[in-house]
Amino acid sequence: MSVTVASEAMSILANHVYVIPPDSDLTMDNYSFKVISPRSGRTKQVDLFFISMANEMSARAVGIVLSGYDGDGTEGCKHIKANGGKTFTQDMSAEVDYMPLSAQAAGCVDFVLPLNEIPDKLKSFAAALKT
């Protein structure tokens, strides 16, 4: 899968991984990205994007929470699950495990995996969506 830094009005393609640009917030609108820069500082960046993605993509949304602080991503994972999407977190191998542990404790995670196993599971999930 390709990994690309998201940009304003970029069309979202299948089988791509998008990364939030530095010092920016990212949302989705009409199946394209909306970049808010500079960051407002008042929002949790991952939650903001995951909630927007859950609203836009419903059951086709997939959220992956890796290493990080402050439990960012937990509320977004709840929204993804509530809309029928799938959520992943890195296991205890995360260098900073606050974000994945917060999402796991909230009960909104489908898969808890080592980082190196996430791509294969993600590919199998994506393949199942095609059928």
Stretch-by-stretch model annotation:
Residues 1-131:
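Conserved acid/base catalytic micro-environments in cytosolic active-site loops
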